[in-house]
């Protein structure tokens, strides 16, 4: 194998890497994917929601054969204090097109399936091997060094996840700052399919996506999540790494307290813990974007910081898929002209501008807006406090609704309310 020269070597068999391999292999390119895990998806962790649009036009109708868990039709967004919660609930009963849908997924299953599609198209996969270094010649990346072997390629796509050491060694990415990432922990809790459907008011393959702000992260930047799978629940939380030194609790303790919350405990009661995982999550959006292109090399997916936390939606998988496709299209174009220079591979960024970078640029100020302690302490307390007063009748003299809202608003501060509101309008 060391004597072969591949058209592309892809480091990482996650979504970006697998899609890049699939698109390249379909066009007859010689592709090698190197994955350090024992299988595709073995080391990949996600909360669990895939927006279908970017994969739908690559594999139309993929959900009919892919191991998706449930079609998300129910959305819940909750503001939580230590013992209470105020929840907004949305149920989508309308018929949607395939590209408008989203699904809960388990990456170990889904990534393995996606890589199988790439292999069937002609891509080669090696697992259980770590790429130690990139091979350079005259300033151009010409291959990789893995397990003592040098494997050459016309181009290399780095899809090796957040905190890519290889990109850092090339000088294309800086060492990840604590302000740019979060720590995510997740439990997979097993329950009978019928119990999940009863508790979340689901029918058939319908699923629910629930996000929680406030007490899950002890008032620090981050939040909790819960996604329904076919016969498991994906439950976890994400907390900004740079805030953990201010935390009064450890992340595992935050998760335990989250599970005991009155709004969560009944949903997971009687469940069996079948898996625990942890992961570092890119949080700064376009503000942590590395140099995407070099001579003979491209960076895609989490390695490029392609993740967006909008508070009400969290995107990463669809961006990774779009980036993988863009990287593959760029390499195919380079193959036609036999030009793998940085200048030629710059087409990659042009492809991204019509998808991931467009979306990330629109919300580039949002990470700084969310990095505000009031978002995860003051405002959840405000929402819960107003809801409590609205629904509590104790026989005392009634109070106008506006007075109830104003009374709780004073705790946040009216200047802060105005300031945060104006900033939110400009950001969103």
Curated annotation (Swiss-Prot):
SUPFAM superfamilies: FAD-linked reductases, C-terminal domain, FAD/NAD(P)-binding domain. It comes from the Bacteria. GO terms for molecular function: FAD binding; oxidoreductase activity. Keywords: Electron transport, FAD, Flavoprotein, Oxidoreductase, Transport. Signal peptide: none annotated. Its cofactor is FAD. The keyword Flavoprotein applies. Could be part of an electron transfer system required for anaerobic carnitine reduction. PANTHER family: ELECTRON TRANSFER FLAVOPROTEIN-QUINONE OXIDOREDUCTASE YDIS-RELATED, PROTEIN FIXC. Belongs to the ETF-QO/FixC family. This is Protein FixC. The lineage of its organism: Bacteria, Pseudomonadati, Pseudomonadota, Gammaproteobacteria, Enterobacterales.
């Amino acid at each position: 194998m060391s004597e072969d020269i591949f058209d592309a070597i892809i480091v990482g068999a996650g979504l970006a890497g697998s899609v890049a391999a699939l698109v390249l292999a379909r066009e007859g390119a010689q592709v090698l994917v190197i994955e350090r895990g024992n299988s595709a998806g073995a080391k990949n962790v996600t909360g669990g929601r895939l927006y279908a649009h970017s994969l739908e036009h690559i594999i139309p109708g993929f959900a009919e054969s892919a191991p998706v868990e449930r079609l998300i039709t129910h959305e819940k967004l909750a503001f939580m204090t230590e013992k209470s919660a105020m929840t907004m609930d949305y149920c989508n009963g309308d018929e949607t097109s395939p590209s408008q849908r989203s699904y809960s997924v388990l990456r170990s299953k889904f990534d393995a399936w996606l890589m199988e599609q790439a292999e069937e198209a002609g891509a080669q996969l090696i697992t259980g091997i770590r790429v130690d270094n990139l091979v350079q010649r005259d300033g151009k990346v010409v291959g990789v060094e893995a397990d003592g072997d040098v494997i050459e390629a016309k181009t290399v796509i780095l899809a090796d996840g957040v905190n890519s050491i290889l990109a850092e060694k090339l000088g294309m990415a800086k060492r990840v700052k604590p302000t740019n990432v979060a720590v995510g922990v997740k439990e997979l809790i097993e329950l009978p399919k019928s119990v999940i459907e009863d508790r979340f008011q689901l029918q058939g393959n319908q699923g629910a996506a629930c996000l929680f702000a406030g007490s899950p992260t002890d008032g620090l930047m981050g939040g909790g999540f819960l996604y329904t799978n076919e016969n498991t629940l994906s439950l976890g939380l994400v907390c900004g790494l740079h805030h953990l030194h201010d935390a009064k609790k450890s992340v595992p303790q935050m998760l335990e307290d989250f599970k005991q919350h009155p709004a969560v405990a009944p949903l997971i009661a009687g469940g069996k813990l079948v898996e625990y995982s942890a992961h570092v999550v890119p949080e700064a959006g376009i503000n942590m974007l590395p140099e995407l292109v070099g001579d003979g090399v491209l960076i895609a997916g989490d390695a490029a910081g392609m993740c967006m936390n909008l508070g009400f939606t969290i995107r990463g998988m669809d961006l990774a898929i779009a980036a993988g496709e863009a990287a593959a299209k760029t390499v195919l174009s380079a193959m036609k002209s036999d030009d793998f220079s940085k200048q030629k591979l710059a087409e990659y960024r042009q492809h991204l501008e019509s998808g991931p970078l467009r979306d990330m640029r629109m919300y580039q100020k949002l990470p700084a807006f969310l990095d505000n302690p009031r978002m995860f302490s003051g405002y959840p307390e405000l929402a819960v406090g107003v809801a409590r007063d609205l629904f509590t009748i104790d026989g005392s003299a009634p109070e106008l609704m506006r007075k109830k809202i104003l009374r709780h608003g004073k705790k946040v501060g009216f200047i802060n309310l105005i300031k945060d509101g104006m900033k939110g309008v400009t950001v969103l």
